[in-house]
């Protein structure tokens, strides 16, 4: 018979990888091709998720306040996963976990206020992984008895804009400014930035084009 023994997969990858891989295959109502090559991708994701909690060779989670971008990433994931669970769209839930993990890795995030809710969030998908991390976090009891996280909409509201600052149409750097900042204040903030002075050099500013919420372009010559 052309079958795959799940015991062999569990022995090689662990039960959580098999569980998440089956969820990741696609919508529940559709037939899905079985391809063991996909198991290594899920295993790689779980290792990356684990590494969020481990830095410099050991467990390392900070109680310091998290960066607003990390909180936005976490609460975007929480919102998406909760919506997907309601629709039984477990495959897109796992995609959301992967996206969040990649973003938090880039941000070098190890803050408890970000990571602890994600442990609770991932517990139905990877229960063994979640229990291990829950214990390492010093939390009492089982993660399955904790309250499932819900998103905080305030973290998802865009309050700033990362403007591309261009000189003669070529983007030279990014400048994050409040979304409600007016045109004159934007112009001042750009001109006060040391990078602007460096790119202008000995040239003169002929014109500055500012479209609030969109672009900044400085014409020099």
Over which residues does each language-model region extend?
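Cysteine/selenocysteine-centered motifs that mediate thiol-based redox chemistry or coordinate metal-sulfur cofactors
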Residues: 198-221
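Short coil/turn linker and secondary-structure boundary residues
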Residues: 1-4, 13, 181
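Short clusters of small/polar residues that mark proteolytic maturation junctions
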Residues: 1, 176-178, 220
